[in-house]
């Protein structure tokens, strides 16, 4: 049996499902909606989740949290698709692939419900006859598009309800020729509607027909000697031309197309949508995707296709996709055909110009995802550093943190490691290995004193930069010796703390009792990462040193080899493992090693095995 908490109750519920299409909702013990899905046959689809040893990793994880089942039957699969999108928006289930914050995507609204419509940015969609264009991927790009419209078309910008009971004094936009003054009653509703129709043409991407229409209107106005109106059309044409000159021509065919690029990493995904209108790249939209871990690319792209195009104000005749997901998108295409009256073509090009466009979209998706993950990491790391600053009452943010650890085997071959984190990330160029020189036996505090002394003296001699914080892997005794070394070096101002492994206790200089902070806080997670990295690096160095010395002593037992030749061997092969794997011919390449000595070395190495 799969690990479903309330398996018996769910089996009873399934008996009432039937074979109708609809949506199902898996719920947790607390009533949280975990996953929303749609099905042609509810009974068959829901039973598939009850399989033992399910091949899908994501479903296995979901099974462990399932406690209850709810469902809604629909008349058709198309109705189920629309309902699925609505339920995902409503419940935001964590096991569904979904657009990040899709409820908040902005649109441009043309308020056709008013006699003198406005054009503005909104996140709220009303069913009152207004036209909405979008969704746009972010409010910045939406406002940039709105700004272009308001510079090209002389539409009103005030939010007053028009017409006013009494005409008012026109605003500065009227004086500058950027508004036709509907608040003053200067323009009839019919004439203003002509301008609004042109705005809609622009937003629909029909700029060629818009330019042609404006040219005709300009000529007609000139023939009627209406030079003021002709000048207005001329200015609009010039602004549209200036806008179009900034757009890149990507298709000589001059068609309207959407090109979708996709990238993923860890649990995050990124979709880039290139809107090509009239053969020109008009808009690049970027959509973060959540919940992609363990999901197939077809599922992710299918979810995006559903969430985006079921809410899109305009759907082009052709959509290019980066993977063959026909099965996932056909139900969406069926719904779009009912809504728009035409069936958009879905293509997966494998070569030619369209494949090149897909690669551009995919490259942009990769860059966008990398930038977003970097920003998220930087934000998280900054939060961790701020917390460490507060924990230790540091004067400034600990941009540079170093950590030191001692490694030895019952006091033999003692080494130390020092690692450096810059802005919360490992900085490998700042890693240091130390062979302990002044101590033998088990004396970790003394060894820490030596290493900190050597490190600080080197910074002073080289006029380097002191770290903002030094973390000692150990307790109060080790920390005390590290502080003594800092005082002796004249660098007592460097903040130092000790981090003991046993209970993740933090020791402060001069404090006998340790402090315990929240182990799962961002600051403590970063400190543990730092300490564990120092330990890993130290153990690796200690193992290498032990192996080297073991090999050297083993080779030195060979008659006639001596210290000098054993050193030459180690230098020539640059590693103990390579010596162990060396053939007689390879040994003969080492200066001072003849056939007789090479055979003795091989015999000695066989003893080790």
Curated annotation (Swiss-Prot):
Keywords: Cytoplasm, DNA damage, DNA excision, DNA repair, Excision nuclease, SOS response. It is found in: Cytoplasm. One of its GO terms (cellular component) is cytoplasm. Gene3D superfamilies: 5' to 3' exonuclease, C-terminal subdomain (1.10.150.20), GIY-YIG endonuclease (3.40.1440.10), UVR domain (4.10.860.10), UvrC, RNAse H endonuclease domain (3.30.420.340). InterPro entries: GIY-YIG_endonuc, GIY-YIG_endonuc_sf, GIY-YIG_UvrC_Cho, Hlx-hairpin-Hlx_DNA-bd_motif, RuvA_2-like, UVR_dom, UVR_dom_sf, UvrABC_protein_C. Residues 19-97 form the GIY-YIG domain. One of its GO terms (molecular function) is excinuclease ABC activity. Signal peptide: none annotated. Pfam families: GIY-YIG (PF01541), HHH_5 (PF14520), UVR (PF02151), UvrC_RNaseH (PF22920), UvrC_RNaseH_dom (PF08459). Residues 208-243 form the UVR domain. GO terms for biological process: DNA damage response; nucleotide-excision repair; SOS response. The UvrABC repair system catalyzes the recognition and processing of DNA lesions. UvrC both incises the 5' and 3' sides of the lesion. The N-terminal half is responsible for the 3' incision and the C-terminal half is responsible for the 5' incision. Interacts with UvrB in an incision complex. PANTHER family: UVRABC SYSTEM PROTEIN C (PTHR30562:SF1), UVRC/OXIDOREDUCTASE (PTHR30562). Belongs to the UvrC family. NCBIfam families: PRK00558.1-5, uvrC. HAMAP family: UvrC. This is UvrABC system protein C. The gene is uvrC.
């Amino acid at each position: 049996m799969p690990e479903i908490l309330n398996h018996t109750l769910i089996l009873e519920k399934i008996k009432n499902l039937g074979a109708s299409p609809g949506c199902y909702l898996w719920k947790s013990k607390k009533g949280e909606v975990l996953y929303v899905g749609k099905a042609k046959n509810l009974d068959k689809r829901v039973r598939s989740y009850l399989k033992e040893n399910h091949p899908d990793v994501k479903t296995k994880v979901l099974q462990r949290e399932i406690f209850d089942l709810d469902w809604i039957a629909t008349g058709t699969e198309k109705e189920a698709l629309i309902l699925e999108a609505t339920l995902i928006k409503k419940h935001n289930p964590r096991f569904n692939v979904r657009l990040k914050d899709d409820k908040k995507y902005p649109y441009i609204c043309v308020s056709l419900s008013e006699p003198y419509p406005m054009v503005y940015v909104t996140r709220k969609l009303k069913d009152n006859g207004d036209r909405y264009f979008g969704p746009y991927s972010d409010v910045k790009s939406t406002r940039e598009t709105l700004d272009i419209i308001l510079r090209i078309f002389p539409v009103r910008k005030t939010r007053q309800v028009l017409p006013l009971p009494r005409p008012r004094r026109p605003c500065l936009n009227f004086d500058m020729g950027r508004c036709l003054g509907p608040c003053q009653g200067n323009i009839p509703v019919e004439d203003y509607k002509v301008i609004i129709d042109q705005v809609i043409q622009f937003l629909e991407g029909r700029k060629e027909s818009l330019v042609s229409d404006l040219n005709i209107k300009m000529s007609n106005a000139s023939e009627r000697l209406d030079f003021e109106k002709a000048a207005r059309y001329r200015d609009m044409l010039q602004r549209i031309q200036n806008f179009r000159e900034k757009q890149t021509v990507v298709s000589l065919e001059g068609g309207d197309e959407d090109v979708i690029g996709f990238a993923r990493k860890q649990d995050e995904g990124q979709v880039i949508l290139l809107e090509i209108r009239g053969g020109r790249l008009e808009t690049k939209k970027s959509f973060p995707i959540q919940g992609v871990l363990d999901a197939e690319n077809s599922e992710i792209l299918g979810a995006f296709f559903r969430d985006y195009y079921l809410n899109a104000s305009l759907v082009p005749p052709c959509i290019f996709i980066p993977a063959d997901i026909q099965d996932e998108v056909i139900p969406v295409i069926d719904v779009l055909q009912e809504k728009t009256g035409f069936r958009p073509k879905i293509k997966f090009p494998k070569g030619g110009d369209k494949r090149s466009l897909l690669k551009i979209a995919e490259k942009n998706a990769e860059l966008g995802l990398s930038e977003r993950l970097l920003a998220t990491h930087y934000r998280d790391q900054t939060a961790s550093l701020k917390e460490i600053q507060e924990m230790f009452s540091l004067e400034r943010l600990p941009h540079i943190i170093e950590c030191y650890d001692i490694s030895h085997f019952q006091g033999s071959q003692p080494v130390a490691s020092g690692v450096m984190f810059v802005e919360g990330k490992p900085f490998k160029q700042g890693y240091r290995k130390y062979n302990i020189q002044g101590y033998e036996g088990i004396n970790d505090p003394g060894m820490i004193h030596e290493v900190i002394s050597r490190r600080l003296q080197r910074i002073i001699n080289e006029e380097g930069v002191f770290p903002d914080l030094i973390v000692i892997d150990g307790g109060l005794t080790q920390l005390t010796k590290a502080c003594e070394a800092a005082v002796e070096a004249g660098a007592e101002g460097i903040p130092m703390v000790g981090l003991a492994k046993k209970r993740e206790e933090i020791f402060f200089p001069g404090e006998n009792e340790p402090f315990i902070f929240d182990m799962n806080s961002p600051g403590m997670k970063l400190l543990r990462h730092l300490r564990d990295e120092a330990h890993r690096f130290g153990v690796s160095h200690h193992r290498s040193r032990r192996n080297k010395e073991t090999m050297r002593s083993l080779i030195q037992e060979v008659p006639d080899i001596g210290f000098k030749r054993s050193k030459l061997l180690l230098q020539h092969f640059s590693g103990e493992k390579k010596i162990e794997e060396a053939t007689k011919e390879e040994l003969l390449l080492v200066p001072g090693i003849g056939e007789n000595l090479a055979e003795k070395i091989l015999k000695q190495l066989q003893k080790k095995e």
